[in-house]
């Protein structure tokens, strides 16, 4: 089989407070994060949003030590995976490629091309596929492959999603069981799955399979857990005025509190590493909301991180991928051709659902332009005298 490499893909996060602003700019510059009909608007809007959010985001990072632990944990996962693969008889070089911060995916690609690999397994550290996570990284990699003849000669395969992997389900079930057993009455504990949300339009318009995979994953984990505990699935981290997948985590917590739930354990289902969404958003913000709602016993299941069962699951995924027919980036970037890119092939005008979507987007852009002009004091309306 020759020299084997494994490329671990993840989001990335600011290592220190000074990194927050450029990290946010990179994040919102991605058209898979904010989908606009005109690409030339992407970077100006990203700059505006990043400028407005930097201070608040820095305050949040201060609460968890001044930076994200994501890089450190991901690199530890890579080392543990390398050791596990060695134990199973498969030698491999491990590379970490982050989408929005160092080490960037491009940096990882530069390293692996220098190592003259014969086979590469591309493994996103997102159990469930979404156009805004794995899909974004796959599209970037697809472009890099198209631009580099050396990459085109490399044998590779992609693991698009792996939420059904038995070892992953077992690791999650073990982590949940450990937390539940800390309560005085374990069978009464409400298991609360909190997944990172995405705009509803991603699912309904673009065909993102994320919601379906999250729901299936939740059911499989509960089946593996094999306990009578009630459970809820909700979505966190909503940003902006558009509708995201519901129920929202904060609303679901309030509703459970109103129903009299006192014991609750939160499961961060779409996260395999601790980072801002677990350490700050769940542990601090959502804990406060839950306690105010009357949920007095609030615990959180830790992310899998380097849990041995989880690392073994990743190793099994790699070995299985090496022994199966290859799955290419062109396939992974468009899972079953369900995921569409904007703009669509042709514009539609009139009272159709597609036209209404586009009319709404144009109205949204006009609103954004107005807000930017009001904040900056510069723009067309000031030039023609309608605003002073």
Swiss-Prot record:
Coiled coil located at which positions? none
Q: Where does Fe cation bind?
A: 196, 277
The protein's annotated catalytic reaction(s) are: heme b + 2 H(+) = protoporphyrin IX + Fe(2+)
One term under GO cellular component: cytoplasm
Q: What class of enzyme is it?
A: lyase
Query: Would the keyword Acetylation be found if you checked this record's keyword annotation?
Result: no
Q: Which family does it belong to?
A: Belongs to the ferrochelatase family.
Domain of life of the organism in this record? Bacteria
Output the GO biological process annotations, alphabetical, semicolon-separated.
Answer: heme biosynthetic process
InterPro entries assigned: Ferrochelatase, Ferrochelatase_AS, Ferrochelatase_C, Ferrochelatase_N
Q: Which Enzyme Commission numbers does its entry carry?
A: 4.98.1.1
Chief subcellular location:
cytoplasm
Q: Where in the cell is it found?
A: Cytoplasm
PANTHER family in alphabetical order: FERROCHELATASE, FERROCHELATASE, MITOCHONDRIAL
Q: What is this protein called?
A: Ferrochelatase
Briefly state the protein's biological role.
Catalyzes the ferrous insertion into protoporphyrin IX.
Q: What are the protein's GO molecular function terms?
A: ferrochelatase activity; metal ion binding
User: Its pathway?
Assistant: Porphyrin-containing compound metabolism; protoheme biosynthesis; protoheme from protoporphyrin-IX: step 1/1
HAMAP family the UniProt entry points to = Ferrochelatase
The UniProt keywords, alphabetically, are: Cytoplasm, Heme biosynthesis, Iron, Lyase, Metal-binding, Porphyrin biosynthesis
| Signal peptide (residue range) | none
């Amino acid at each position: 089989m020759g020299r084997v490499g494994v490329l671990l893909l993840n989001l990335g996060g600011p290592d220190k407070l000074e990194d927050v602003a450029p990290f946010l700019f990179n994040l919102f510059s991605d058209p898979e994060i904010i989908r606009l009909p005109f690409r030339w608007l992407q970077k100006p809007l990203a700059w505006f949003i990043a400028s407005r959010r930097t201070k608040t985001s820095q305050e949040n990072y201060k609460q968890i030590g001044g930076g994200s632990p994501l890089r450190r944990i991901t690199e530890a996962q890579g080392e543990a995976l390398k050791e596990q693969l060695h134990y199973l008889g498969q030698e491999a070089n491990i590379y970490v490629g982050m989408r929005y911060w160092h080490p960037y995916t491009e940096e990882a690609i530069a390293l692996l091309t220098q190592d003259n690999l014969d086979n590469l397994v591309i493994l996103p550290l997102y159990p469930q596929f979404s156009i805004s996570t794995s899909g974004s990284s796959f599209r970037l990699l697809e472009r890099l492959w198209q631009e580099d003849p050396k990459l085109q000669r490399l044998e590779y395969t992609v693991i698009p999603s792996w939420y059904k992997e038995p070892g992953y389900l077992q690791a999650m079930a073990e982590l949940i069981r450990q937390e539940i057993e800390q309560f005085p009455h374990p069978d009464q504990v409400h298991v609360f799955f909190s997944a990172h949300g995405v705009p509803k339009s991603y699912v309904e318009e673009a065909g993102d399979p994320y919601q379906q995979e999250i729901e299936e994953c939740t059911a499989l984990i509960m089946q593996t857990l094999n306990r009578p505990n009630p459970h809820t699935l909700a979505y966190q981290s909503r940003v902006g005025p558009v509708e995201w997948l519901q129920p929202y985590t904060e609303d679901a917590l309030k509703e459970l509190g109103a129903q009299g739930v006192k014991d609750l354990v939160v499961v961060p289902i779409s996260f395999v590493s601790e980072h801002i969404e677990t350490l700050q958003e769940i542990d601090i913000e959502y804990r406060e909301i839950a306690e105010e709602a009357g949920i007095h016993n609030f615990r959180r299941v830790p992310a899998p991180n380097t849990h041995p069962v989880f690392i073994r699951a990743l190793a099994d995924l790699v070995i299985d991928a090496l022994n199966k027919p290859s799955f290419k980036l062109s396939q992974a970037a468009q899972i079953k051709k369900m995921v569409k890119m904007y703009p669509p092939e042709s514009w539609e005008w009139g009272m159709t659902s597609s036209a209404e979507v586009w009319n709404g987007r144009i109205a949204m852009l006009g609103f954004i332009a107005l807000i930017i002009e009001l904040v900056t004091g510069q723009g067309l309306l000031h030039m023609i005298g309608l605003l002073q």
